[in-house]
Amino acid sequence: MELHQYLQRLLPEQSPSELHISSITGDASNRRYFRLTDISNSATTVLCIDPGFRGRDPRSYPFLVVRDLLAENGIRTPEIFRHDSETGAFLLEDCGTDMLQDHVTAFPDDLGPLYDSVIDTLVHLQSIRGNSSSVPFSLSFDREKLMFEFDFFITHALENNHRATPSAQDLEHLRQQCEQITTLLLETDRFVLNHRDFHCRNILVPEGTPVIIDFQDARMGLPQYDAVSLLRDSYLKLPDQRVGELQLRHWQQLKDRGLQNTSFDTYLRLFDIMAFQRNVKALGTFFYQVDVLGNRSFAPYISSTLAYLPGYIERQKELQPAGNLILNLLDTYVS
């Protein structure tokens, strides 16, 4: 469809000629975003074209269900003004382009209070409870999901990567190790709601207030999953001291809200194991984007993500067989 056809469905009262339309660069998804600026008054909104929404029931579509859930619980998200399931389009509030990544890069002194606020928002999100038979509470980081992410990495980072030369024995051994790591992460009694992609590009900070986007894949899992996404971020490396402070803040707030009763040492152990899984999953995505889709903008994040692995391996012996094998097979990417 042409853009004007989407606009006719969502804004039938306004002529496309009255709007200035500019493309917004998205992340690793098939959704497309455009900023619409009303020429008469400079007011802006965002057009999102989501192929997955086309023909779906809005009452059960995860993007709408999760957005309403977060908004009802006081989590700041872009408002949805209109939607049209026939074309798969949304008209959203424009919360600007100031991502957490950009903001911290431009204002490094904000690394303290701003990240404290983001951790507080995360714990607020992880405190939300709901019906276990309904999305997003019916979904979880179960064995099937975690192993799917490991297998995606094995396929795109190793099997289909001409710069890696794994043997069949290497791949079988690695998959066995991934199965064992997955088992360590299946502590379902500790599961809470997770955003699932809680990194610095999915948090906008207009006027310094966190606004959460790209939340449609929310599901249940260990609270460390989202904390890892934020604190062991492929796109933005935080100082180790600040990471330690934020880990402590996250753990303490989980305890204060009755969401966890583990020691801080146990929290840190699961954090490392979860971080290993999460970073390996991210590597699979980056190789897929670069080698399959030809999107080389993700290439720089391969080495920065691999750089996290030695720390996990050193601290957690359970990760050593898989971690050392991955680093050896991808040694050409290790800086």
Regions found by a protein language model. Give the residues of each.
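Active-site acidic catalytic loop and adjacent metal/ATP-binding pocket
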Residues: 31-37, 47, 125-126, 179-225, ...
